[in-house]
Amino acid sequence: EVQMAWFGGLSGVQARRLVPGSQAIAQGLEDPDFKSYFIANTSTGLSPSETLTDAFVEQPSFTFGSKGSTSGRLMPEFYLREAFNQSPDQLFEKVGFSGDHSATIALVQSGAYATGAVNYKVWERELEEGKIDTDKVQVIWETPGYPDYHWTVRGDLNDKFGDGFTQRVTDALLAIDDPVLLNAFPREKFIPASNDDFAPIEDTAEAIGLLDAQ
């Protein structure tokens, strides 16, 4: 039985629905303003833009990351639907799910897919590590910010471990300042979070059919 877990935005919402009473207690400093990058192979001729353009969805193929990823599927699909009022399957001849962000970058860089969507932190890390050839793949559009990764605990921790236990766990997370520990996530530091912070994720998942409406 898991008492506490580090979730992405969507997986956290799903977990809290499965375990009523569970609480989001902390998130990374960066997480209230998380982003996805829409990327394209340079052979498409697409250029960076302030908006998603018709030229982007005129490309033949698009790949998400994991089907359950907030930054690699949920929010990118939301913004595609918002911009063009159609599902990805209606917009592109071929829609794929790479399984993870690194694979998405590799598939678009190789030309296996013309376009894709990735977690911005993975892109920035791999760019810094020299794994991305910007002569072959580039960022075309950046989404608005949205909430994502966070810590969630079961709602019965105080009953099992004593009054105030959940708050002590929260305080311990917020107090972490060891660079090695923080870099494991990687986050600059942790800040408070609540279930309400992730209402936009839940609403979006319901709107595109990934969650049943409550």
Language-model features: locations:
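A conserved helix-loop-strand patch within extracytoplasmic ligand-binding domains
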Residues: 28-84
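Ligand-binding cleft/hinge of the Venus flytrap
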Residues: 53-59, 70-97, 124-133, 207-211
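Ligand-binding clefts/hinges and TM-proximal coupling segments of bilobed small-molecule sensing domains
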Residues: 58-82, 167-214
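Short helix-initiation/N-cap motifs at beta->coil->alpha
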Residues: 7-10, 87-106, 147
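Hydrophobic residues within well-ordered alpha-helices
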Residues: 1, 55, 108-109
